[in-house]
Swiss-Prot record:
Organism annotation: Homo sapiens (Human)
Family per record: Belongs to the class-II aminoacyl-tRNA synthetase family.
Spans traversing the lipid bilayer: none
EC number, UniProt record: 6.1.1.15
A Pfam family recorded for this sequence: HGTP_anticodon
Gene3D superfamilies in the cross-refs: Anticodon-binding domain, Bira Bifunctional Protein, Domain 2
Record: disease: Developmental and epileptic encephalopathy 75: A form of epileptic encephalopathy, a heterogeneous group of severe early-onset epilepsies characterized by refractory seizures, neurodevelopmental impairment, and poor prognosis. Development is normal prior to seizure onset, after which cognitive and motor delays become apparent. DEE75 is an autosomal recessive form characterized by onset of severe refractory seizures in the first months of life.
Subcellular location: Mitochondrion matrix
Role this protein plays: Mitochondrial aminoacyl-tRNA synthetase that catalyzes the specific attachment of the proline amino acid (aa) to the homologous transfer RNA (tRNA), further participating in protein synthesis. The reaction occurs in a two steps: proline is first activated by ATP to form Pro-AMP and then transferred to the acceptor end of tRNA(Pro).
Transit peptide start and end: 1-29
A single MF term (Gene Ontology): proline-tRNA ligase activity
Name of the featured protein: Probable proline--tRNA ligase, mitochondrial
Length: 475
């Protein structure tokens, strides 16, 4: 038990946030509810009824490759449900995980001075025509006309919109800079061949930040600051990322880096030097010379999923829209810009791809939709007398461990065996599964505790369970 406690206490820690109580239902399982009087019952969580693999997969567009572990698991478990090619319904478990991810992102962005905004998804064509990206983006840009014939696009990114906003402020001073403005919103891209579920879709969530500085030197400092925040984010999530030099593509600029999760199904080809810290997307390298440009050692090739991208833009956009500020000498000066993206839904899917087994979802500890699932005995079984104990344990956990209020599910499907419910809990990847089995009838009662992220199983008393769960931190 001591080893189990030590490992669980080592889980990433973040400040606990308050939670909304919507979604709680009156307790049907145990009549003696605590003051809050609510329990989260698994039977009330919305799940698609037709989760048989053949049925779910038949709903997919025939051009959509189902060769990706995360996509298969998310469909089979009921985390997502197909809507149309490249578009998915995000179901309750996924929404909870995504909201937690957004909270972690908010913490990291605001820790470096980021201010959250929300820009329209509809972007006027003239903004994109000014930068020539209306044509450069080609068919990937989703375009439409309103009833007056005015053209718009559904923005995949917002460099034009944010720069036009800053340009409209005519009395900006250097004393107000830097601005670090970011949003977490839906984005759209007309992918010719959507694939791999949330890894490459037509509609997705992205965090995009745009920075405005008073000088190239200050902009480079901001660039490093945001990159460090990205590193901190992925470290907190426990994801094995690599930062690589990258091409600027249609966004432009002079410096660019990608944050990649190395995995076999990744669409990006990476070159990593095992001797030094050099790493790059292979599209930036001369393929005829595959030695490290830093130490001349041989480069190792791998594949990766891009989950973040950073760009130092300079004055590429500010010069077009005349986004200026008044410098220390009182002269109008173009702002130095950067832009920074995180694929929110892609991070979720990529994390499942990297961390999960072939049959069971595994989450970054901070992002698990629920931290624990409690399984009472089957109705009519010899252990049914322990039902009251598991209800009391649920109430005690949610009252005595404030950060776990709203983080614990009670699997009240007591018509099913413990084994069947444990199998389901394993598939969903709750970090902790607590079972009232035969040993719950002992004096004192012992609960079977599965720690999914370490693979350990222990039999603990009520006090032992509390010692295990009290250090768990949520976001």
């Amino acid at each position: 038990m001591e080893g189990l406690l030590t490992r669980c206490r080592a889980l990433p820690a973040l400040a606990t946030c308050s939670r909304q109580l919507s979604g709680y239902v009156p307790c049907r399982f145990h009549h003696c509810a605590p003051r809050r009087g609510r329990r989260l019952l698994l039977s009330r969580v919305f799940q698609p009824q037709n989760l048989r693999e053949d049925r779910v997969l038949s709903l997919q567009d025939k051009s959509d490759d189902l060769t990706c572990k995360s996509q298969r698991l998310m469909l089979q478990v009921g985390l997502i449900y197909p809507a149309s090619p490249g578009c998915y319904h995000l179901l309750p478990y996924t929404v909870r995980a995504m909201e937690k991810l957004v909270r972690v992102i908010d913490q990291e962005m605001q820790a470096i001075g980021g201010q959250k905004v929300n820009m329209p998804s509809l972007s006027p064509a003239e903004l994109w025509q000014a930068t020539n990206r209306w044509d450069l983006m080609g068919k990937e840009l989703l375009r439409l006309r309103d009833r007056h014939g005015k053209e718009y696009c559904l923005g995949p990114t917002h460099e034009e919109a944010i720069t036009a906003l800053i340009a409209s402020q005519k009395k900006l001073s250097y004393k107000q800079l830097p601005f670090l403005l970011y949003q977490v919103t839906r984005k759209f891209r007309d992918e010719p061949r959507p694939r791999f579920g949330l890894l490459r879709g037509r509609e997705f969530y992205m965090k995009d930040m745009y920075t405005f500085d008073s000088s190239p030197e200050a902009a480079q400092q901001t660039y490093s600051l945001v990159c460090d925040a990205y590193c901190s984010l992925f470290n907190k999530l426990g994801l094995p990322f690599v930062k690589v030099q990258a091409d600027v593509g249609t966004i432009g600029g002079t410096v660019s880096h990608e944050f990649q999760l190395p995995v076999d199904i990744g669409e990006d080809r990476l070159a990593i030097c095992p001797r030094c810290s050099f790493s790059a997307n292979m599209e930036t390298l001369d393929l005829s010379q595959m030695n490290c440009p830093a130490c001349q050692g041989p480069l190792t090739k791998t594949k990766g999923i891009e989950v973040g991208h950073t760009f130092y833009l300079g004055t590429k956009y500010s010069s077009i829209f005349n986004a200026q500020f008044t410098n220390v000498c009182g002269k109008p000066t173009l702002a130095e810009m950067g832009c920074y993206g995180l694929g929110v839904t892609r991070i979720l899917a990529a994390a499942i791809e990297v961390l999960s087994t072939e049959d069971c979802v595994r989450w970054p500890s901070l992002l698990a939709p629920y931290q624990a699932c409690l399984i009472p005995p089957k109705k009519g079984s010899k252990e049914q007398a322990a039902s009251e104990l598991i209800g009391q344990l649920y109430d005690h956990i949610t009252e005595a461990v404030p950060q776990l209020h709203g983080e614990v599910l009670l699997d009240d499907r007591t018509h099913l065996t413990i084994g069947n419910r444990l199998k389901d809990a394993n598939k969903f990847g709750y970090p902790f599964v607590i079972i009232a089995g035969k040993r719950a009838l002992e004096d004192p009662a012992h609960f079977e505790v599965w720690c999914q992220n370490t693979g350990e199983v222990a039999f603990l008393t009520k006090d032992g369970v509390m010692d295990l769960l009290t250090p768990v931190q949520t976001v």
